[in-house]
C-alpha cells in the first residue's frame, strides 16, 4: 500500500535495543526551530531504545549542505555505529533548494558506501514552514 494512504505516525513497531550502540547526530543550525525539534525527537527515540546518554554525540554544522561533512567527521574520527543527519530545507523562489537537496542527498549516500556505515537521512525538504511547524511537539 502506498504510504500516502497510511498514517506513518501511528506505526508502533518495537524498537531494537540500542544499549550497546554509539550514535553520532549531526544537526544543521539553519532553521533551528525545526532542527532542534528533530534533534529532540531523535535523542528521545534513542534513549527509549536503551541507548545511554553518554553514547550519543551531537555536532552542529552551519546548514543542511554541510551535513555530509559532519557525518564524515563521525565516520572518520569517532567510533560511532551509526550517524543521524538532521536538517531542513525550505523551498524559495530560486533553484538553491534543488542544489542543496541534491548535494546533501548525494553526499550522505556516498558516505554510507565509502564508510559502510548507516547514516539516517533526517532532512525535511518542504515548500513552506506549515508542514514542519509541529516538529517540536514530536518528541
Where are these regions (language model features)?
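N-terminal amphipathic/basic leader segments beginning at the initiator methionine
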Residues: 1-18
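Glycine-rich phosphate/diphosphate-binding loop of Rossmann-like nucleotide-binding domains
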Residues: 21-55
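Short glycine-rich or small-residue beta-strand-to-loop segments that form or flank ligand, phosphate
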Residues: 22-29, 59, 85-91
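Active-site rim loops that border cofactor/substrate pockets in soluble metabolic enzymes
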Residues: 49-77
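Glycine-rich phosphate-binding loop
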Residues: 66-108
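A short acidic, helix-capping loop that chelates divalent metal ions and anchors anionic groups
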Residues: 92-94, 129-133
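Short, acidic/small-residue loops that bind anionic groups at enzyme active sites
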Residues: 98-125
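Conserved small/polar residues in nucleotide/adenosyl-binding loops
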Residues: 135-139
Amino acid at each position: 500500500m502506498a504510504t500516502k494512504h497510511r498514517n506513518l505516525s501511528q506505526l508502533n513497531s518495537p524498537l531494537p535495543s540500542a544499549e550497546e550502540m554509539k550514535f553520532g547526530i549531526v544537526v544543521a543550525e539553519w532553521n533551528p526551530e525545526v532542527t532542534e525539534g528533530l534533534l529532540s525527537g531523535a535523542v528521545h527515540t534513542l534513549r527509549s531504545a536503551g541507548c545511554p546518554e553518554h553514547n550519543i554525540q551531537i555536532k552542529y554544522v552551519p546548514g543542511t549542505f554541510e551535513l555530509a561533512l559532519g557525518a564524515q567527521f563521525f565516520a572518520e574520527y569517532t567510533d560511532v555505529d551509526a550517524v543521524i543527519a538532521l536538517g531542513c530545507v525550505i523551498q524559495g523562489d530560486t533553484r538553491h533548494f534543488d542544489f542543496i537537496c541534491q548535494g546533501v542527498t548525494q553526499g550522505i549516500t556516498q558516505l554510507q558506501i565509502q564508510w559502510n556505515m548507516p547514516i539516517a537521512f533526517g532532512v525535511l525538504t518542504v515548500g513552506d514552514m506549515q508542514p514542519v511547524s509541529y516538529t517540536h511537539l514530536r518528541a
